[in-house]
Design a protein with these regions (language model features):
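Transmembrane beta-barrel architecture of outer-membrane proteins
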Residues: 17, 27-31, 72-76, 119-124, ...
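Gram-negative (and chloroplast) outer-membrane scaffold detector with strong preference
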Residues: 41-136
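Outer-membrane beta-barrel domain signature
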Residues: 4, 20-27, 62-68, 109-117, ...
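Predominantly the C-terminal beta-signal and adjacent terminal strand-loop region
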Residues: 130-179
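Membrane-embedded beta-strands of outer-membrane beta-barrel proteins
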Residues: 34, 77-79, 124-126, 142, ...
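Short glycine/proline- and aromatic-enriched beta-strand/turn motifs that initiate or cap beta-hairpins
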Residues: 2-44, 48-56, 149, 170-179
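Extended hydrophobic secondary-structure segments that form protein cores and membrane-embedded regions
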Residues: 14-15, 92-96, 141-142
Length: 179
């Protein structure tokens, strides 16, 4: 896709982007994001930030009455190389993500202190585009990430609540605007 000025470069905006992630949290994590990037011929580089719906998780300890409320945000940087057929494009991608999770304990005898963790993840995926117009595309992506850290969510003096998963699978759906 070339910009209207006839150059092989173009700026793109991804908004809104809906995400559903499996595995990092105990239940699917639903999020919304916004991104921007550039295209050069068949190459794309874009960054997207997401915020996810909070989840409450109970401790894995038998008979326990405590847990944590988890909130997550993620920043992702993708590089993709696409192949276009008429109005459709498919592009394999590699990705680098930075995960941010906060946890606040709850339950009997728990002081509700807030703690956070930040760690990187690496991944790969596939994104497909359907160009409804030259300046607007609907895209869908499926990607997998290996988390380079596995934070533990624990309540001091009470025990482990949960350890976050080593990998994540993410499905996204959004609009790409090409000014």
């Amino acid at each position: 896709m070339q910009s209207t000025a006839g150059t092989p470069w173009s700026f793109v905006l991804h908004a809104p982007v809906l995400a559903a992630d499996l595995e990092l949290f105990p239940r699917p994590a639903l999020g919304i994001g916004l991104g921007a990037g550039i295209r050069y011929r068949a190459w794309q580089i874009f960054a997207t930030g997401y915020v996810y719906r909070a989840q409450s998780v109970a401790s894995l300890e038998p008979g326990s009455a405590f847990g944590a409320r988890l909130r997550r945000a993620s920043g992702q940087l993708f590089t993709c190389h696409g192949r276009r057929w008429s109005q459709f494009e498919a592009a394999p991608c590699i990705a680098l993500a930075l995960e941010y999770v906060t946890a606040r304990g709850f339950g009997e005898g728990v002081a509700p202190r807030l703690r956070h963790a930040v760690w990187p993840a690496v991944g790969a995926g596939l994104v497909t585009h359907w160009y409804a117009l030259e300046s607007l595309a609907l895209f869908a992506a499926l990607s997998g990430y290996v988390e380079l850290a596995r934070p533990r969510v624990a309540i001091q003096d009470l025990g482990l609540v949960r350890r976050l998963a080593p990998a994540t699978v993410s499905a996204t759906l959004g609009l790409e605007w090409i000014p």
